[in-house]
Every structure is written in C-alpha cells, then in structure tokens.
Amino acid sequence: MNCRPLEKYDPKAFEDEIYTKWLKNNVFLPDNSLFEKFSMVAPPPNVTGVLHMGHALNFVLQDVLVRYKRMKRHNTLWLFGTDHAGIATQAVFERHLKKIGKSKDDFEREELVQEIFKLKDRHRGIIVNQINKLGASYDHSRERFTLDENLCKAVNKVFKDLYFKGLIYRGEYLVNLDPGSGSVVSDEEIEYKEVDGKLYFVKYFIDNSSFIEVATTRPETMFGDTAIAVNPNDERYKSLVGKEVTIPLTTKKIKVIADFYVDSAFGTGALKVTPAHDPNDFEISKRHNISKVNILTQDGKLNKNVPLQYQGLSAKDARFKIETELMEKGFLQDVKKHKQQVGHCYRSGEVIEPYLSTQWFVRMKPLADKALKALENGELKFYPKKWENTYKYWLSNIRDWCISRQLVWGHRIPVWYNVDTSELIVSDTDPSLDEKNMGKRFVQDPDVLDTWFSSWLWPFSSLGWPNVDVDFKNYYPTNTLITAYDIIFFWVARMVMAGLEFTGQVPFKDVYITPLLRDKQGKKMSKSLGNGIDPLDIINEYGSDSLRFTLSFLSVQGQDLNIDAKDFMFGAKFANKVFNASKFILLNLKNRKILNDLKFNDIDKWLLTSLNSTILGVESSFANYKYNEASKFVYEFFWNDFCDWYIEISKIDLNNENVDIQNMAISKLLFFLKKSLLILHPFIPFVTEKIYSEFAEKEDILALNEYPNFDIANNFQEEFEIFKVLKTFIIAIRTLKSEFNIPASVEIDVALKFDADFKYEAYFKANESIVKRMINFKNIFYNENYDGMLGVAAVGFEIYADVKSLIDKTKELIRLEKQLEKYKMLNISVSKKLENENFLMNAPKEIVESEKLKFVEFSSLINKINNYIINLKNL
C-alpha cells in the first residue's frame, strides 16, 4: 500500500482546509436516525466581541464533549448563536459615531436601530470566524441571534405571560444608573472596587448659632436630602428630633427624624437621608413617609433640583466645586481620607449612581422557589458540586429583577400607552390597529428589555419555542450546559427558572462550571490587568490542536487554571508527536501489503487491553466532566504505550527479512494507528483528521467514524500483566543507566535471577529480542553468578547490571550519600506537616493529599538510594 507522504507538522497548512471539509460534508449536523440524543446550547458571545481565552476554554471543552458524543453515535445537536448584548453593542456603535463626528441624537430611533444592525452584521463574522478557528463543531445551519424573529416572538410571549400572571409590574424604585450608557443595570451587573475617597463633616444649621454635624462621602447629594436621621437611643440628639435644619448652600429646611437604622458610632451619628440616591435612605423614607428628590439626569449630571451653578455638572465635578464653597462659607467642619467600596458597571466601568426611576420588574421569588426545588430533587446537577452553594445562595436571597433598559438596541418592551388616557396595553403590535381601538392614539414604551431577558430563554427559544416543532421535541431539554462561574446567577439560574415556568422542565440536566483562568502569579486573567493570553496568538504559533489539548489536559475539575503562553508548548509537542509517529507508520506502508486477517501476539494483546482500559477511562471521565483525566488517558496510551513501546517493538518485525512478517507488522501498526486517531479525535481533531485522510478512502471522514467501544473479546488480562513484568525489567535497567549517567547507547551485560515460584521465565527468554531493542545489552544471563554487578530488586526476580567499569565508585558513593541526606531532610519536613493536626484540619484537601504523595515518593527514593549504596559498597 502506498499513500501520500506527510511533510512536517504545520497546522497552518491544513487546519482551515479541514474545517471547510467538515462543513462541506455536513459533519456537524445531527443524525435523526440515531436513537440516543445529546444536545447542548453554547453560551452566546456578544456579537461585537472578540475571542478571549475564557471563550476559548469554554468552547474547547464544549467541542471536545460534543465530538465525543457524536462519535459515540448520539444524535448530537450543538446550538450556537450570538447575543445582541444591548449595552455593550450600543456602546461600540456610539464610539463609532464619535469617531465620525456624529452622535445617536442625529438619528431617528428606527434609523438608529438599522444602523446598529449594520454594525452587528459587520462584527458578527469576526467572533464567529474566531470560534471556528477553535474547531467548534456546532450546527452552522441552526445558528441563532437573540434578535432573530422567532426569538423576538418568544421574548414577547414571555413578557405577556408573566405580566398577566402578575409577575411583571411597573413601579418607582431605586435602581442602578450607568451614566455612561444612560441605562439602568441590575444589582448583579455591579462590581465593587475599593477607592480612596473622603469623609466630609458638614454643618446643617438649626439656627444662626447651633447646628448638627453630618458625615458624608457624597456632599453633592445633599440637595436631595429630605431628612436628617439619628438613632432614637442617641442621647446627643434626642432633643433635636422633630426640629428643622437647613440644607447648606440652600434655604431648604428638612426635619430631624429618629430611626434605628442609624449607627451612632459611625461618623457623627447623624445621617443625611437622600431617598432618591441611596438604597438604605430609600427604605427609611418609606418608613417615615418622607419625600424623595431626584437630583440627577439620566446621563448622571446634576439636574434642575440643585442650585443653578451646579446644574449640568457630573457628580465628581460638582463634589469638588461644592467642597470649595462649603469651606468658603463655613459649612465644612472637617475632611478626612476614607477608603470605600464603590459600585462600577461591569460592562462600562462607570461609577454606578443609585437613581429613583419608574422601571419594569419581574417578581422573582415564585420563580426562584421552583428552581431551588429542581436542585433539591436532583433534576439539576452541578460539576463541581461546590457551585450548588452559589446557585442556592443567589436564589435564596433573590430580589426582583429590573428588566427595563434605557437603550434603543434590544427587544422593545411590548407595552403601549394611550396618549390621551395613559391606559396601558401589553401587545406585540400597535393597539390602534385593532378595530376596538379605532381613533385612539398609542405610543410604545421607549425602553428595551435587559439583554438577559432574551438570554434566559436561550435553551428553548433557540429550538423554535413557542412553536413546538421537530427540533424542540427532539432536543429539548438539553443534556448539558458548560459555562463560567461568574454567570451562575445572571444566566444559569435564570434559565432554570424560565425553563420550569414555560416548559415545565429544567432546560438541562448537568451544569459543568469551567475552571477560572489565572496567570502564573495566581491573578485572575482580565482585560484591566492586561494579563490575558490571546488564543489566536497561540493558534498562529502552535495550531488549534495545541491550544485545545493543553486547555483540556489542564482543566482539573474544581481547581483554577494557572497558565501562561509557554504552557501551550505541551499541546504542541503532543500534536507533533502524533503527527511524527503517524508519519513513520505511513512511510512504512510503501510497497507493503495491508492484511485484513490480523494475528495478534502477546504484545498486541497487551496493547489491545491497554486500549480497552483507555476507552473505559475516557468514558468514565466524560460522564463526570473530568476533562483532565480523559485527556491523560489518551495521552498516556498514545505517547507511552503506542509510541514508546509498541512502535519501538514493532521495528523488530518491520526490519525482519521475511516479507510476510513485515506486512503483518505494518498492518497491525495501521490498525492501532486508526484506533489511536479515533480516541484522540475529540481532543485534537485537525491533526487526526489530516493524518486519517492520508490513508483512508476519499469520502471517509474520521469525525463521522464511531468512537471505539470497550470490547471484552480484546481484554487479555494475563498477557497485559506478563508484559508489565517485562516492562518493569526494561525500565529498571534504563533507570539504572540514567541515574549513573551511562549513555543509553552503551551496551552492558545484564542478568536476571528469578524467584523459585516465578512463572514467566520462559516468556522472558522468548522475548530477548524485545529487551535487546529496548535497552541495548551486550549479554543477558539467567540465574548465574552476579558478582561485580549492581542489583535492583523487583517483584518475582532480581535485576543485575555490569556497570563497574563504567562508573567511578568513590564519586558515585559521595553523590548518593548527598542525595540520601537531601531526601531524608525533605521527608522529615513532610512528616512534621502530616503529624500536625492543625495542618490536617485546615489545609485544603488537595494540599494534604499532595504532601502524602510526597511522603510516599521520598520514602521510596530513600529506600532505592540506600540499596544502591549497599550494592556499590559490595562491588
């Protein structure tokens, strides 16, 4: 058999071509002829986003699982799409307008929406093509966008259903204003950062000579004060309760009230109450029925409710100006440095302003109760299990969800108001088109819905709901969700709530939370720190398979992933190993006949058994989302068993003069190569598909082949154990040569002394050619005189090697004594830790286990070095 020769491993030369081949041959489409179903939806990336390492990790782990399920003959659907990302996309568009000297105010609403759609169309290809570079095998024909017509239909239906159930309402509440976008954001979209601020001690005068001193971090909000609150038990202020004070720099008077919320020990013990701009003050105002004064515009500027000289200023600029005037006019008693936690919008980075506004909300508790029960009943599982606590915490402490956003980009709220009567109608279309509303005029609510309001419907809206068509029936509920920990509440919990409310089922059974990416210093990777790694740089340098295998191999369930760019060399070396080993086999096909009737010897049976074990290990690992274990199984099989042992041993028969023996050897190598490519394919699909295409039939695609199954007929436990014994001997001689710095190429005499009950003596003698190939010996002796040889004990036999003439005995003894002392000291240190009850009780479980392994390792090394020393002294 002859095939096209592989050149050097150059992923740039074939990865794009392979991906196109998969698309052309509909590899990623589900197969409805298969009985068992596997479906999964991908977290939709922002349509204007670019690929980062978090995306890469998430999509790689999804794709590895999807490819495995597809090859295991599941009817597999992986649904992908992009998110319209309201605030983020509109911000990108407004930055674009600024560059060309325009603003959003230059457009009518519909014109603006159309312009943003054009931007979306230009950007969508960027993130999608980048995800394709990873080898993502999602169904391209079913790609969705959260503003697609059917998804809009689903959003409107959900809004209406919740409204008529009394679970959506409109009310005036304190919300979180992002001044950058002019929109409100939810509590969960806020990141708190410690900032260096000031604590201002301000005088609120009762009359010309007496005043009450108030401590505040935000003097600019005093124009929204409607009371001063003190603790009822604070003796200092009891006589002032009920009296009026004047807000500094104004003539406005407000009352002193008593409320137990006030902490007498903080500041001066007197609290300015600003209900429209502080959540705690808002609650105080409700208890005391006092007014609320909003001093901000929607873009975070001071409004007409403040003195004229401050109107139009940002809060920060106003604070500086007010501080100066307070000082000049004698209202400022003191200013102290003060560290404080300040909320920032996680999307825009802007400081959040508490803001009194009329908004739309979802009552969440009735939905959350059902979602909690789903976890308790076992309908939903998290991997790792620890993330169940995060899920439970959010749902147990849930607040109503503010779903309205002051944007033009997104799902328009399906609510209309009668221009003349303010009557409210919930409808997809203009109610004036209805005959019963003839002559009435309506305007639609100007706000759009929070981006997450469409995202929480993703598992079923992307499958056609509210239409219950073939896709919905076949693939809902989905099997698995793979996502990041930081959107457990934003997305995961909300999807569970929506799924239960609108379909009566959880939208997925398993939730796998990916590791948190950190740099080598343990810092979380983030754009602000600039410590991220661009996955496209890694792909350009090493290829997609290198990125994929490294991320999968290092993804230990429940542990953070500390990584830098150099780590991807690991995946590159493995992909290169696969390529070069395959190249060796394919080169040896030349002028040889491939046999179908394979005769397996004991070494073949050892490898078949190892393959069986690997298949079981991979299956068990994927069942529990242990990617690193699955990766390790295939890595160990291919690199160690297949390459380091089987291929090397096969070279004996490949070099045999008998052509029939050569043909049998290459036929078995090709058989095992195909099995190897199959088990490796989900992890490194590009290089395995490329290699397979070099010897398979033209129309045969590796990705559509069945993943090998455990085969009891290929489980040869006795042959497996026998070869393990032979390996022990070979490894012992190799190790001995290495530890005494004897080059592997140097031939030495070796000897074996078998125990009386050792039953594999004949096997050893029959396989001398393998031993010769693997350790390069001069002569091998059995049960003879071992004087002058260095010995190593093994189970069932003793191993001896003649190294006396190749080493300096005195120097080696000195070296070994130093090594022995080093490992004894290390073992003492580990022993002390393991004897310390505090360490055992308080240290993380993985650290304790690591120390136990060290103790075993050091003890073994001490024993081995001691034996070397004793043997050397007797030479």
Curated annotation (Swiss-Prot):
Its EC number is 6.1.1.9. It is an enzyme of class 6 (ligase). The keyword Nucleotide-binding applies. ATP binds at residue 527. A motif ('HIGH' region) lies at residues 45-55. Keywords: Aminoacyl-tRNA synthetase, ATP-binding, Coiled coil, Cytoplasm, Ligase, Nucleotide-binding, Protein biosynthesis. Residues 803-837 form a coiled coil. It comes from the Bacteria. It catalyses: tRNA(Val) + L-valine + ATP = L-valyl-tRNA(Val) + AMP + diphosphate. GO terms for biological process: valyl-tRNA aminoacylation. InterPro entries: aa-tRNA-synth_I_CS, aa-tRNA-synth_Ia, Anticodon_Ia_Val, M/V/L/I-tRNA-synth_anticd-bd, Rossmann-like_a/b/a_fold, tRNA-bd_arm, tRNAsynth_Ia_anticodon-bd, Val-tRNA_synth_C_sf. ValRS has two distinct active sites: one for aminoacylation and one for editing. The misactivated threonine is translocated from the active site to the editing site. NCBIfam families: PRK05729.1, valS. Catalyzes the attachment of valine to tRNA(Val). As ValRS can inadvertently accommodate and process structurally similar amino acids such as threonine, to avoid such errors, it has a 'posttransfer' editing activity that hydrolyzes mischarged Thr-tRNA(Val) in a tRNA-dependent manner. This is Valine--tRNA ligase. The lineage of its organism: Bacteria, Pseudomonadati, Spirochaetota, Spirochaetia, Spirochaetales. The gene is valS.
